[in-house]
Amino acid sequence: MNKTEQDQLKKEAATKAAKMVEPNSVLGVGTGSTVAFFIDALGERKEREGFSLKHIVTTSNRSKKQLEGLGFKVDELADIDQADLTVDGADRVDDNLDGIKGGGGALTLEKNVAINSKKIIWIVDESKLVHHLSGFPLPVEVLPVSAEQNFKRFEAEGLKPQWRLNDEGKRYVTHYGNYIIDLAADPTPVPHGLADYLDHTVGVVEHGLFLDMCDEVIIAHSDGTIEDKKRK
């Protein structure tokens, strides 16, 4: 499948998700190539139906600029109590609809939006599907003051940590001024155990394991089909 065909599938999946958004609701919007198609589909609804939303919050400046360019007003997370629906992408999704997110470095804001949402839908293509969470480094955001100790601790646990670097080869700094340590992309058969370990590690701000959060995944398959998979 070439990129044009893949983009067409992503667009179809994103359009399906856009149809699920209720008018005058509070919407959370993630980021990524598939989410960009979702935002375009919202813009088409706005133009065609006069579609509007009560509030929109987003997890990236890129999505914010795209939404504002289509005439939507984007609010801060602090401006809302709870999103009715959040639509986002994911770096990996397993059979239980648990996922790894944060490849773009915005995992803390992504999780904040997610936990303040009544419903979460992820849009992905089939390349993101795995049986057990693996095949993509797990990002862990850490405080600079404890980063070295965290790195050594992760090494001792056999988690094969790597510093995330920017384009200049220096440590990547998040929106909140923290570092990211990427853990090994090895299979994670017990993700809840790893999440619990990270949740109780001093200096860890947030991690990219999104467990028991996603309600529905819309999957674009290479055979041209769109699958709608819901949490059991």
Curated annotation (Swiss-Prot):
Belongs to the ribose 5-phosphate isomerase family. Catalyzes the reversible conversion of ribose-5-phosphate to ribulose 5-phosphate. It comes from Lactobacillus johnsonii (strain CNCM I-12250 / La1 / NCC 533). The active site is at residue 110. This is Ribose-5-phosphate isomerase A. Pathway: Carbohydrate degradation; pentose phosphate pathway; D-ribose 5-phosphate from D-ribulose 5-phosphate (non-oxidative stage): step 1/1. Signal peptide: none annotated. It catalyses: aldehydo-D-ribose 5-phosphate = D-ribulose 5-phosphate. Substrate binds at residues 31-34, 88-91, 101-104, 128. GO terms for cellular component: cytosol. Homodimer. One of its GO terms (molecular function) is ribose-5-phosphate isomerase activity. Its EC number is 5.3.1.6. InterPro entries: NagB/RpiA_transferase-like, Ribose5P_isomerase_typA_subgr, Ribose5P_isomerase_type_A. Keywords: Isomerase. Transmembrane segments: none annotated.
